């Protein structure tokens, strides 16, 4: 109501300018001053008094506010008179402002009683306490981890109780795994101790085994000399048969200190260590004598001889050490129809004879039993078996070493009951050639790559020691009684062998 006082325009009497007398029945004219443009922006709403009715009783004033007028439409400069209808027996015109002020004054508010006010304050305080308690309960419920769907300060919903349950489950599983691992570790440790104890007992009961290796010189048997004496101490090598031999096909050092040489044109010759010819045979019934072998004081030689049909065929001929004929046995007859490039004869400790044949397009291995029965062990096309050696006999198994000249490897063949039961390929040197074995079981190989004869470590199957330097290609040689019999073009070189390291 206080703001409305500023909008009231007071009535002022001007007797000098007005000729119309005023009376209680005469309508009074209220002049409203023209508004200023600045007042329109300061006061957006203008209020006007329409009609004041005066009666005999207290004056009755009716004030109505017009609808809001936009500030952009100013009023006209003219003054619009407004007529007020008066009621008879009204108060004089000069008392109207006082009545208006009395009507517009705020009604007095009765002061509350002290007891009622105290009760109201207590009620308000209790209501505030209840509201605070409810707010605290809601906040604690939101932050309590045990409450499902609890929220944090950022209102991100998650179930922390479910996380705790998963975490506890994972911990229990990890503990179970650790316990299981601990049990298995203890079990493995116990088993290891038990196995170690058994191995120790077996090792104590088993006989002690010594391995013979080339590196351990104390285990290598000493090189034996010929019973009749070998080369002089100051002589390393000698040449025999020079000018006599033409096409050497095999050499052999006999225990008697003599050297046997087979020649395809000359026949069989027997030399001493000084190079003198002791015996010589070239029978007309035999030709193409190859690969002599010494076995139980007899000499076995491959040669062509006439069979029952008076045809030339391959035979194994037996001679004495004095070159006397003993017997013969025919080789597989179909070999006479093939072109043979190379042959090699070898005999094992169980008296089984083995024949290796290398043809133009094939290679074969054959076995002759003591009862005179031939068996074909292997037949290979596109293979070149250039040499063969009966290496060892272990019980019923005989091991053969076969050299493959095209692919440069050595084949270890195991034979049992006239049948190959196992084979193994080995690379004992760069390019293996002829093989030889002395009376002590040492194995020698001709290395065509280094043009040398090397000692082979039969534990690792690699060449370890250089024994002699030779020509690039050696078809065959013999090692026996500390001497190497190496065939040359038209002579035989006897050389004392010793072990020199390759490094």
Swiss-Prot record:
Chain intervals with Polar residues compositional bias: 147-156
Classification lineage: Eukaryota, Metazoa, Ecdysozoa, Nematoda, Chromadorea
Name of this chain's protein: Uncharacterized protein F44B9.2
Species per Swiss-Prot/TrEMBL record: Caenorhabditis elegans
Biased composition (Low complexity): 16-26
Region (Disordered) location: 1-26, 132-156
